[in-house]
């Protein structure tokens, strides 16, 4: 949920005017909730309705935030970006395609029987299991989940010889009635047939890297693999961007050198976004909360907001095709 001040910033209105709109329009599905400071909190669905009231909406996109290098924050940033996008009015789905299932562990509602969850293994093994029947409400407002399990490693046996261009694309047709605006694929740090399908199905791929040579090489390989797969299977190349994650002291010479190398190597694909390394983020994940609950450094929140502007931008409805 977001405050009236934050909603006002998105709609270019004052907090007072946001309160007026909430009181004047009973069809916004708003039930007043306040925190301990008596601040009004606006849920995701109400924020989406406010956007529509002002002839605005979230631009629909399918997204990946990952590269072929583990430990650079891909899953954490997927989760934080998904939660923030939902707060801003997006209806968000996170499809966990990583057998490690960290996104599932974080998002899974406490009262759900995990043993009954259908994952990509069952979805691709049995055509009678449609994707819409696998969607769960997560613990976070406006965020939904298709879960993963460790056994999902076996799914690759089902996909031998399959065209990755069509694997996920066909399954997504089952979701057309659910009106998701923003879909995230959380992937393992490998280029399997299923993750390949997710990369070339996405509208935008954001590749995080740290300042290490391994991280930079992972981003480079991921970009090359996506482009080669798109050429091989005659798929449109998604928008591919690279950004610096887990950035330590930016005054250090090694970080500056890495940044300059990234800019030279990736050119216009390099985003001017640096996600700072902060214990607040680790603590939030370990506590099962987002960085927008409780204490977290503002520079981290601001950097995540920049990612949200890319994967879930808000535009005039007339500009959205």
Q: Which positions does each model-derived feature cover?
A:
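P-loop NTP-binding core
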Residues: 3-5, 9-10, 15-16, 20-23, ...
